[in-house]
Regions:
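Hydrophobic alpha-helical transmembrane bundles of multi-pass membrane proteins
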Residues: 2-313
Length: 313
């Protein structure tokens, strides 16, 4: 600290801030990076390369969705809260990925602790690549981790939109940490790691692209948060509902289009392979989004006598 304080322009508070950031910077440089265990691996097949490359591209699209979420939320809120929402979306995704790397992935895909209910494989994500993975044209653990971590971040971002303009930055960060490190991974293990949802009598539970694991978990968490926090300030005056228009619908519209693009990573990428079903899923995603936009336009025109951009988004 004495060295930092000796530098011109550094106050005591700034010196403490830089010292606090040092461990995180070291982690980013690779001090805590877990390297794969070396073993003799077979030759990489075309299918193996295609599957992993496709999932990596899909992961980038899913991560890019966070820009869409941030723009939709910021554009639909009041101007005074826009900076808080943007900061929240950016930081929470970084926090979610770190929490999922530290313990979340292990809780979701680890070994059974309580059969069907709880799994754990130790702290920190293990990136070990095996010969079997390559021979079966499977996914490299690091690629699979990145895709799943992007899903975890999405679950937290869903909640962010539902409690927008209702919660302070610090409190939401704590909640997002608990959600992405424990709640989401445990719920995900119930289906994607052979948990109890796979053995409910004769009924087969199928979750494609996180319909329940990501979106339902995020939605339920957001609903509880909205109920506990109550309505936004100014939403009700003398018991009457007041419209709170967004301050920048251009940004919100652009965010919606970015989300549309991101869905081509979220849904087709959930095939976890480059196969014949990927284009089919992409077409279904396109028609679903188009149908939703058309339906919202028609309904808002009937109820409000004119199209409502907020409803279309």
């Amino acid at each position: 600290m004495l060295l930092l304080k000796g530098i011109r322009g550094f106050s005591s508070n700034r010196a403490m801030t830089w010292l606090a950031c040092a461990p995180l910077a070291l982690m980013g440089l690779g001090i805590f990076t877990l390297s794969a265990k070396a073993e003799e691996l077979p030759e990489l097949s075309a299918a193996f390369l295609a599957n992993n490359l496709w999932l990596l591209v899909a992961t980038i699209l899913v991560i890019f969705m966070n820009a869409g979420f941030a723009m939709v939320e910021a554009g639909m809120c009041r101007q005074k809260n826009a900076v808080n929402i943007l900061a929240k979306n950016l930081f929470v995704f970084a926090l979610a990925v770190t929490a999922y790397w530290f313990v979340g992935y292990s809780l979701m895909y680890g070994d059974s602790v309580i059969d069907g209910w709880l799994y754990f494989g130790g702290l920190f994500f293990d990136p070990t690549v095996t010969a079997e993975t390559i021979s079966d044209a499977g996914l490299v653990p690091t690629v699979d981790f990145l895709f799943q971590a992007a899903f975890a971040g999405t679950a937290a971002t869903i909640v962010s939109g539902l409690v927008a303009e209702r919660i302070k930055f610090g409190e939401f960060v704590i909640f997002a940490l608990v959600l992405t490190a424990f709640i989401y991974p445990v719920a995900g293990s119930w289906e994607w790691n052979g948990g109890w949802l796979n053995s409910v009598g004769s009924v087969e539970f199928i979750d494609f692209a996180g319909s329940s694991i990501v979106h339902s978990v995020g939605a339920w968490a957001g609903l509880v948060g909205a109920m506990l926090l109550g309505p936004r300030i100014g939403k009700y005056v003398d018991g009457k509902v007041q419209a709170i228009p967004g301050h920048n619908m251009s940004i919100a519209t652009l965010g919606a289009l970015i989300l549309w693009i991101g869905w081509y990573g979220f849904n087709p990428g959930s095939q976890l392979a480059m196969d014949q079903w990927v284009p089919y899923v992409a077409v279904t995603t396109t028609l679903g989004a188009a149908g939703g936009a058309i339906g919202a336009t028609v309904i808002s025109t009937i109820t409000s006598k004119k199209p409502d951009l907020t409803m279309i988004i």
